């Protein structure tokens, strides 16, 4: 039987409503897979204003990546979205390898950290940095359906692919019994030819600038794999990663590897971590692929406890370890039910007729619009229009974050 578009969307919407309205679900599997909130846990203590300013600024930078593949980002640093917020940035290049899970979009820019007046009259200044932003997906098909692929062995690249003949360095860390999601790894393989040569040149030109990797959704998983190659295979230091709504990239071995490479088990200075995995209340994507299949989240989580926009410093919690019950791992059962319903609905999506829009994606796959929690990271990410998503129109700067606010 062939479904009409409206029928398909109605069925899936009903599933979402049923999922989010259910308060309890017995999660099948071992007790290690059972995630429940800790009612006696203390309320989050919040984060500092400088760290909040850093995360908020990076969320706008990754939102700009959604202009790649649509209206574009042009030199010096122009786009129809939030580029005017960053007059100190200079675009180096942008790439777009295609629309599939194994493809990638993003841009490389240099932030010279010089305060200037933007079109709105506000001053914007950031610390000098080389910025690499990885776009997420426009399609829920990529986010949910394609997360079903089989993982494969993960081995960091032994040497850069810039044509040099020097032998690879002996890595300080080794990845033992690691597997990685095939689609994520292939996406990075397709991307590295556009990123690594540029980064090598920029490091020589700006040796004191840190490399800031930032990604949303599937772009977060690519940023993670890119960072591992830079840190382990190339031995580069001063690499900082910030992801928003990052899926689980691989198995427990890979999660442990990320923890070791970025020293994420050191809780003495959580705001000083070099890997920040930002998650959001009710966002199902950080829970995918499912733990039943052996996938595991790495540490470094920064949890936004407030569901609706806009959060404040007191709404954000610095999580401890890979599986902090006060963070996304302790999501109540309704979120786990939502996640499973979203995933198992893939049979309905793939069995339905393939009505495509001009960009090649079936209309029914645009269900990411229903997953606001996956898009609401300080701002509503994912739409390249003036001022960002219409949900953000009329919103000024976050209170307390003036042009002179120091960032971390």
From Swiss-Prot:
Induction of expression: Transcript accumulation reached its highest level in 6 hour old cultures.
Subcellular location: Secreted
BP terms from Gene Ontology: lipid catabolic process
Residues modified by glycosylation: 177
One GO MF term attached to the UniProt entry: hydrolase activity
Signal peptide: 1-24
Catalytically driven reaction(s): a monoacylglycerol + H2O = glycerol + a fatty acid + H(+); a diacylglycerol + H2O = a monoacylglycerol + a fatty acid + H(+)
Record note on pH: Optimum pH is 7.0.
Assigned keywords, A-Z: Glycoprotein, Hydrolase, Lipid degradation, Lipid metabolism, Metal-binding, Secreted, Signal
Keyword Signal appears in the UniProt entry: yes
SUPFAM superfamilies membership: alpha/beta-Hydrolases (SSF53474)
Keyword Phosphoprotein among UniProt keywords: no
Alphabetized Pfam families for the sequence: Lipase_3
An example Gene Ontology CC term for this record: extracellular region
Thermal profile of function: Optimum temperature is 35 to 38 degrees Celsius.
Predominant subcellular localization, coarse grouping: secreted
Top EC class for this record: hydrolase
Active site as annotated: 217 (nucleophile), 283, 374
InterPro entries xref list: AB_hydrolase_fold, AB_hydrolase_lip/est, Fungal_lipase-type
EC number(s) recorded for this UniProt protein: 3.1.1.-
Function comment: Secreted mono- and diacylglycerol lipase involved in plant virulence. Has a substrate preference for p-nitrophenyl esters with a carbon chain length of C10 (p-nitrophenyl caprate).
Protein family: Belongs to the AB hydrolase superfamily. Lipase family. Class 3 subfamily.
PANTHER family reported for this sequence: FUNGAL LIPASE-LIKE DOMAIN-CONTAINING PROTEIN-RELATED, TRIACYLGLYCEROL LIPASE, PUTATIVE (AFU_ORTHOLOGUE AFUA_6G06510)-RELATED
Protein name: Secreted mono- and diacylglycerol lipase 2
Organism: Gibberella zeae (strain ATCC MYA-4620 / CBS 123657 / FGSC 9075 / NRRL 31084 / PH-1)
């Amino acid at each position: 039987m062939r479904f009409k578009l409206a029928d398909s969307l109605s069925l899936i919407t009903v599933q979402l409503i049923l999922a989010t309205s259910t308060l309890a679900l017995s999660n099948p599997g071992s007790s290690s897979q059972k995630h429940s909130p800790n009612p006696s846990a203390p309320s989050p203590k919040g984060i500092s204003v400088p760290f909040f300013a850093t995360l908020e600024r990076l969320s706008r930078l990754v939102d700009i990546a959604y202009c790649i593949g649509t209206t574009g980002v042009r030199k010096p640093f122009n786009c129809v979205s939030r580029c005017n917020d960053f007059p100190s940035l200079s675009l180096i290049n942008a790439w777009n390898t295609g629309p599939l899970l194994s493809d990638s979009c993003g841009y490389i820019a240099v932030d010279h950290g010089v305060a200037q007046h933007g079109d709105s009259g506000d001053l914007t200044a950031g610390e000098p940095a080389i910025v690499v932003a990885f776009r997420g997906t426009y399609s829920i098909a990529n986010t949910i359906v394609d997360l079903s692929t089989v993982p494969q062995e993960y081995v960091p690249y032994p040497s850069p692919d810039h044509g040099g003949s020097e032998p690879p360095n002996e890595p300080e860390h080794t990845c033992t019994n690691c597997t990685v999601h095939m689609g994520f790894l292939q996406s990075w393989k397709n991307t590295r030819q556009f990123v690594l040569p540029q980064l090598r040149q920029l490091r020589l030109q700006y040796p004191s600038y840190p490399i800031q990797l930032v990604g949303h959704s599937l772009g977060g998983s690519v940023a993670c794999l890119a960072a591992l190659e830079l840190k382990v295979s190339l031995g580069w230091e001063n690499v900082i990663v910030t992801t928003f709504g990052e899926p689980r990239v691989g198995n427990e071995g890979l999660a442990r590897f990320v923890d070791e490479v970025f020293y994420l088990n050191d809780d003495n200075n959580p705001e000083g971590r070099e890997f920040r995995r930002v998650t959001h209340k009710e966002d199902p994507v950080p829970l995918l692929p499912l733990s039943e299949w052996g996938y595991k989240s790495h540490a470094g989580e920064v949890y936004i406890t407030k569901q609706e926009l806009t959060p404040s410093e007191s709404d954000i919690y610095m999580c401890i370890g890979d599986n902090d019950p006060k963070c996304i791992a302790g999501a109540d059962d309704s979120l786990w039910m939502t996640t499973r319903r979203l995933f198992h609905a893939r049979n309905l999506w793939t069995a339905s007729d393939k009505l495509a829009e001009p960009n090649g994606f079936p209309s029914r796959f645009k269900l990411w619009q229903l997953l606001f929690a996956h898009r609401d990271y300080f701002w509503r990410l994912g739409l390249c229009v003036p001022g960002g998503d219409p949900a953000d129109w009329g919103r000024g700067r976050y209170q307390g974050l003036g042009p002179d606010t120091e960032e971390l």
